[in-house]
């Protein structure tokens, strides 16, 4: 025990930090498991025996085959036939790249009105590919938290249309996106898949689809072809909607649709649709109208019988231009295809058949709606066994259903039932949420204990107790449904822990408080109360939407407090009598305030923000400014603020040249692709420049890694921890700028020099210094174009260095997290440069206080209309930011253990 105490007293800082990080991690996972619950999956499946039918499975099929052509991110206005509805007119500005680029589909709608239909196809948030595929095959609505499965999707186990197809003795063929195989393995008779994660590659997947689909149509042993093209989506991610590459991909898809309509036979129905839309910058994941709205184009070949058109509606530009019906939900495709091919509707489906596709036979349509309602009521009754609140409303709708005698009433009944099931899917585990909050408060208390007790040895019994408590918390996370005993044991342990910390806080020798000095204590620790107030402002959705403004105001206010303290010291206001230190103080304020103002002008806007305009510039337009800013920032870090080591200077300046070459080649690729060309030499040149650009990016990262080792091998004999960390800060600045991109490079450069400048304030006040660093780190997230929304995730960062088909997904994921939360990395490096070993713990404490506010706000507003749009993303991003900051600090501890 003495040996352990001796070891703990000398080398315990990193161990303490690991214990603290684990405590925060488990607390957040417990709360997330209670708040963002995955939908309960029923293992039941539909079958032909569910319905009594003499010759068929459920109903007589209308078609024998179907083709799904999925054009990823096909927004509705991309396919809308403007020429049909508005005549030939000049498109305004950048609209020429994405409007009116599918004229062949417009011609089919105009010339074959009874055989071609177009609907707005509305998806459910989150608009990520995994969730959309799941909805398209099961007819269900995935939960918000399942957006994380987009990186490592789990297999779909519940009933789906592909399983029904196989059970009926039919088969399916897959072409294109390999995600389908990951989610639905062993479902396809033949598959010709390509990797889907490389957003820099616009053509590989699409070309593979085009090369195989016509040969597949010629075969006679298929019933469903799923062809998933990714070029439009990747063009959006890489270039945005207003680019010649977007026009090229839309025209290519338009031509493919025309060729399919000519190749298919009369027994086949073609569905062309998108899985989601995109924003003007090509992003998706959220629930804005542009992200949710995609298109569904349905087509059958004319059969020569003009009196019996296959569809009961025609495309109409006036009024309800979507064929006389309301917009179609994405889940509606599942029951529609099932009954068209005479397949049992998958058990978890909550979609409604698309009536115009079934023709004009009202009696047959009523029967199809009855089958749709039967399946949905069956699912709702089974689901109600697990969701008691559903039962009363279900009984009311069931009574209305029994008295329904016409298609309109039956349609409304199905719609009401679908809405009821959707609302019941939004559930949470309140007891687990409370344990998660209790755990987070305990982690905060543990954090405070480690700060105020930093100079003393942590008692051995406390390590034993916290280890046991961590095991209890782990049991809650891994249990499918935690039992009452687990909850009681964990809560009791947390209560005992909090009581211990409270007693230590009140009576411990190092942090003893006299109540008569309580007011003085509050003022001396105002930064903690200030951060708590900032955290609790998350109860207001307006604060979340305008959080960047609040952070910027807080930074400026804190610096003004530092100025007031300086003025209190320098009461003599003569400019000639002021100390050099005070003049430098004023100079640093003059640098920081305008920098924050400039960064504010270029922040990205959220959909909910009013009077906000996002300045959209191409990377080519911003390249000169990024080059200039990166040079100034590098010079400032190397030659002015911190005198760089010779070996660091030897590495950084050549690295800056490599960065410029990388940007130049990247810019040339963007420019050349913006000008349509069919010349093979041009395409070869583009490929060469792309390869050179990525090779330079790899070289920059490789040289940075070499520097980490070289500085220890060949560095100064007097190299210490602080100098080494300064060299790391100087060295990683250029890879960070490159990772975030030329478009945001100049903003990243601003942030890089703001931290050393802000270091001048509160040099002898560790608490205020850490609070300022924490606020600045949080603001850098917004300064580089990010928002607390899924569609603002910088996917591009994953592909700057690595190819899209890189085997280990955690590596590109780490690049994305670094690009988003690089401010926390910089703040962590700055904290480890301080003499105070508590600085990293203060940094984590301030960040965790903000997370506490997000946690409480998300629980309180769980039923709020804006929960999934504002409060849930806020909690997720704040939690990930805290865990990422813990990871950054852990890595720094590992790298500095030898000092």
Predicted regions and their residues:
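Short, low-complexity, Lys/Arg-enriched N-terminal segments of secretory-pathway carbohydrate enzymes
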Residues: 1-9
């Amino acid at each position: 025990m003495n040996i352990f105490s001796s070891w703990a007293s000398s080398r315990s800082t990193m161990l303490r930090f690991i214990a603290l990080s684990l405590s925060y991690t488990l607390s957040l996972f417990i709360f997330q498991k209670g708040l963002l619950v995955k939908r309960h999956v029923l293992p039941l499946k539909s079958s032909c025996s569910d319905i009594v039918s003499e010759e068929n499975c459920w109903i007589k099929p209308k078609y024998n085959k179907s083709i799904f052509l999925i054009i990823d991110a096909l927004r509705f206005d991309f396919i809308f036939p403007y020429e049909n509805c508005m005549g030939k007119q000049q498109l305004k500005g950048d609209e020429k790249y994405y409007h009116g680029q599918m004229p062949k589909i417009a011609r089919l709608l105009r010339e074959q009105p009874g055989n071609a239909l177009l609907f707005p196809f509305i998806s459910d948030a989150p608009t990520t590919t995994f969730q959309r595929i799941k909805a398209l095959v099961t007819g269900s609505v995935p939960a918000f938290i399942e957006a994380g499965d987009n990186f490592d999707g789990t297999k779909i186990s519940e009933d789906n249309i592909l399983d029904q197809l196989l059970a009926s003795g039919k088969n399916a063929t897959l072409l294109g996106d390999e995600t389908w195989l990951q989610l639905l393995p062993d479902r396809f008779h033949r598959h010709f898949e390509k990797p889907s994660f490389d957003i820099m590659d616009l053509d590989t997947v699409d070309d593979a689809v085009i090369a195989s689909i016509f040969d597949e149509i010629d075969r006679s042993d298929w019933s469903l072809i799923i062809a998933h093209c990714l070029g439009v989506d990747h063009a959006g991610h890489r270039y945005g909607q207003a680019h010649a590459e977007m026009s090229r991909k839309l025209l290519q898809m338009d031509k493919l649709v025309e060729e399919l309509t000519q190749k298919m036979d009369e027994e086949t129905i073609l569905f062309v649709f998108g899985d989601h839309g995109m924003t003007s910058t090509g992003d998706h994941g959220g629930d804005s109208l542009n992200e949710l709205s995609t298109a569904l184009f349905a087509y059958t070949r004319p059969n020569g019988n003009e009196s019996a058109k296959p569809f009961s509606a025609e495309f109409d530009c006036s009024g309800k231009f979507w064929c006389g019906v309301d917009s179609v939900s994405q889940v509606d495709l599942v029951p529609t295809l099932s009954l068209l091919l005479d397949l049992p509707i998958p058990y978890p489906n909550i979609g409604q058949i698309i009536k115009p596709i079934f023709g004009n036979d009202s009696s047959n349509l009523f029967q199809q709606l009855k089958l749709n309602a039967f399946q949905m009521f069956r699912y709702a009754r089974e689901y109600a066994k697990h969701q008691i609140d559903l039962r009363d409303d279900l009984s009311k709708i069931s009574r209305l259903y029994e008295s329904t005698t016409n298609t309109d009433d039956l349609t409304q009944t199905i719609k009401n039932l679908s809405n009821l099931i959707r609302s019941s899917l939004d559930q949470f585990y309140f007891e687990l949420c409370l344990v998660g909050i209790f755990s987070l408060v305990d982690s905060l208390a543990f954090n405070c204990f480690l700060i105020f007790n930093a100079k003393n040895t942590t008692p051995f019994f406390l390590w034993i107790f916290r280890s046991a408590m961590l095991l209890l918390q782990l049991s809650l996370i891994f249990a499918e449904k935690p039992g009452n005993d687990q909850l009681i044991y964990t809560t009791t342990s947390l209560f005992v822990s909090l009581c211990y910390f409270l007693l230590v806080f009140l009576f411990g020798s190092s942090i003893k408080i006299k109540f008569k000095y309580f007011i003085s204590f509050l003022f001396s620790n105002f930064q903690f109360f200030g951060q708590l107030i900032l955290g609790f402002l998350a109860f207001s959705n307006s604060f979340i939407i305008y959080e960047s403004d609040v952070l910027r105001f807080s930074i400026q206010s804190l610096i003004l407090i530092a100025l007031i303290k300086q003025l209190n010291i320098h009461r003599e206001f003569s400019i000639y009598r002021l100390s050099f230190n005070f003049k430098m103080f004023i100079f640093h304020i003059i640098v920081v305030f305008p920098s924050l103002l400039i960064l504010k002008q270029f922040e990205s806007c959220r959909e909910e923000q009013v009077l906000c305009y996002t300045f959209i510039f191409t990377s080519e337009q911003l390249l000169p400014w990024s080059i200039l800013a990166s040079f100034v920032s590098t010079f400032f870090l190397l030659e002015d603020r911190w005198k760089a080591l010779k070996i660091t200077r030897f590495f950084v300046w050549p690295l800056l040249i490599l960065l410029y070459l990388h940007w130049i080649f990247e810019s040339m690729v963007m420019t050349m692709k913006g000008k349509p060309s069919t010349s093979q030499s041009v395409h070869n040149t583009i490929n060469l420049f792309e390869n050179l650009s990525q090779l330079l990016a790899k070289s920059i990262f490789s040289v940075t890694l070499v520097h980490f080792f070289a500085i220890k091998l060949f560095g100064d004999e007097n190299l210490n921890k602080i100098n080494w960390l300064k060299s790391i800060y100087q060295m990683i600045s250029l890879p960070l700028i490159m990772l975030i991109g030329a478009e945001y490079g100049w903003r990243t450069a601003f942030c890089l020099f703001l931290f050393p400048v802000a270091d001048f304030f509160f040099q002898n006040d560790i608490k205020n210094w850490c609070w300022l660093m924490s606020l600045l780190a949080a603001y850098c997230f917004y300064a580089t174009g990010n928002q607390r929304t899924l569609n603002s995730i910088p996917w591009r960062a994953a592909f700057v260095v690595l190819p899209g088909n890189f085997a280990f997904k955690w590596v590109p994921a780490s690049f994305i997290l670094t690009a988003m939360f690089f401010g926390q990395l910089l703040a962590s490096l700055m904290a480890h440069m301080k003499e105070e070993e508590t600085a990293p713990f203060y940094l984590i404490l301030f960040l965790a206080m903000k997370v506490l506010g997000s946690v409480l706000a998300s629980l309180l507003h769980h039923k709020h209309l804006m929960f999934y749009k504002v409060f849930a993303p806020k909690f997720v991003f704040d939690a990930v930011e805290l865990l990422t900051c813990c990871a950054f600090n852990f890595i720094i501890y590992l790298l500095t253990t030898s000092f």
